[in-house]
């Protein structure tokens, strides 16, 4: 098996550098990569690197829609992530790099589900969720394409259509709404079952 080295950080960003007025203190993927290299945990013996980043860039104070355009954000993401991934590949040439996509956080339209309790979901009109979700999905897809990496498109796999996201009534769903009675650690993120699903999909892609 593979030995796990975890350099992830809650709130990590792809391209927005840390700043004193950050909504949540964070580092960047590139900083995580450099830390792993400095610790000699990322090298020619590394076989697998998984990366998930993009959502946390969207709400940083200096990256809001009033201050940036979508083409600017797309370009900044691509430059930062391709740089970080190519850095990984330069020191770990034997590693497979997998970009982990995010689940669909909507009901398939412009609503997100604020609560999912006792089989009843509430649908909140929140078009920015769908807008940014599509943006991040395309950013990740292009970064994988431009670096010859794998992209796990989880919007396609965990959605209301598949019956597995936070808007779904399946008690074994993989995504949690903000107020959710399925077992999970953080609102609006993966459920315990969702973490297991991601793990299985990573293993399948690695093989």
Label every PLM stretch briefly.
Residues 105-207:
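Catalytic His-Asp segment of secreted/periplasmic serine-dependent ester chemistry enzymes
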Residues 3, 94-96:
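Residues at the starts of beta-strands that form the adenosine-phosphate
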Residues 1-75, 79:
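Conserved SGNH/GDSL esterase-like catalytic core that processes O-acyl groups on lipids
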Residues 6-8, 101, 153-155:
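Residue-level recognition of beta-strand->loop/alpha-helix junctions
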Residues 44-62, 68-89, 98-99, 103-151:
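Conserved N-terminal glycine/acidic-rich loop preference
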Residues 35-39, 83-88, 142, 201, ...:
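A generic secondary-structure signal
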